[in-house]
Amino acid sequence: MNELRVTFGLFLVICAPSATALASQAAQPSEGLLEGSSLEVLSRNFYLNNDYRSPSPSGKNYTREWAQGFITSFESGFTSGTVGFGIDAHGFLGVKLDSGKGHSGTGLLPVDQEGRSEDDYSSGGGALKLRTSRTTLAFGEMTVQTPVFDTADKRLQPEYATGLLVDSREIDDMHVLAGHFTAFKNQDASTSKGNFTGYGVSTRTGGIDFIGANLFEERPVGGALYASQLSDTWRQYYGNVHLKQSGVFLDGNLYHTRDYGESVAGAIDNTAYSLAAQYTAGAHGFTLAFQKINGDTPFDFVGGDSIYLANSIKYADFNGPRERSWQARYDLDLGSYGVPGLKFMTRYVNGRGIDGTHAPQGGGYNPFDESSGEYVPQQGDGGRHWERDIDLRYVLQSGPAKDMSVQLSHVVHRANSAQGGDDIDRLYIVIEYPLKFGRF
């Protein structure tokens, strides 16, 4: 049994009796299994257009998909008693509206063996949950949000993970999360698989474990500490410190990753950090950020949003080996100008200094190419790139379609050959309408 699982086991042993003791002293009132339940159906209409200005890895110059999705989420309440029981469930249906054989591959829809977008796909899942005092234990398929493992929601369907999650608030100003996950459902898949994939890793056994805490979440000064372990691949540690005060937000993030066990991705010794400062004055927000990757391999992660560094943005993560990047961002809330619900954002990130030629030979970031008889690093020496994002989002404030949102996003990314990324112009149009049925 590895060290992180021992830590996780000790957490459960310690947490369970303390929670039971607290509950026996003053059990939380429960609304009931059905009385505390809620149901929501999110309608998501998604158009994604990729215009490649240089040859893409797939050989396509242009990909485009338009699809309609329906995401149903049910959350039950808990039964009464010292230990309450409940269930959460979710379902998804995605339907193709427009695409073709030459235009598939945006990630909105699955692709069949002939390279065509499938007409539709669906999935479902759920989790059993137990609550005692201020601690909840869930087992099954769910979304996860932590800095070391975070399922993304960037396309038509959210990502899901299957496993065990403990969520505890027994101590004031401390939100503890611990988990063990063994399967993952990608954004364009109907079923979960027992593999976790990143930039240079693919592990099919054991899964991922983590434990950590968010500290002083509702106070001006807060932070977080987490540790995770990807089976036979790496151990990763994360720390955060942030300050919110009078229109100023300062945020610092740090990751350290070392290879572990069988080291299936090769040797890894990587430290990544970012520093961001935001100033808000009325309707205007101004942000500057700096990010640095120290190590011969990229900063890698599994789970689509498991990177809380400041310069991980719409298209690129700016996480190449030895890469340094900076960001300038501007936000405008047009509610102050008579259009409540309308927000605008633009940002620019520039990264350079990438050198992937020192990645360990034979590892996931510098594999051996049998056809050429040479090692081929993912990135060369002198890599550089930049990205510019423009977002416009409007949320209806009243009327029959209240809470419906329309988002228009445009992304431009340019890179040299050593960076290895695409020269791409990308357009997103996303329309969402949540139907909330409240509590039963």
Describe every region a protein language model picked out.
Residues 20-140, 332, 390-397, 405-440:
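Beta-barrel outer-membrane channel/assembly domains of diderm bacteria
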Residues 35, 64-70, 120-124, 158-162, ...:
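Residues that define the transmembrane beta-barrel architecture of outer-membrane proteins
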Residues 45-47, 137-151, 176-178, 211, ...:
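Transmembrane beta-strand segments that form the barrel wall of outer-membrane beta-barrel proteins
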Residues 74-105, 114-193, 215-217, 221, ...:
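Outer membrane beta-barrel
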Residues 81-85, 134-138, 173-177, 185, ...:
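Repeated loop/turn-to-beta-strand initiation elements of outer-membrane beta-barrel proteins
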Residues 95, 174-199, 246-325, 417-422:
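Outer-membrane beta-barrel translocator/channel fold
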Residues 151-158, 183-187, 203-205, 227-238, ...:
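Solvent-exposed loop/turn segments connecting transmembrane beta-strands
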Residues 301-393, 397:
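C-terminal structural cap/anchor segments
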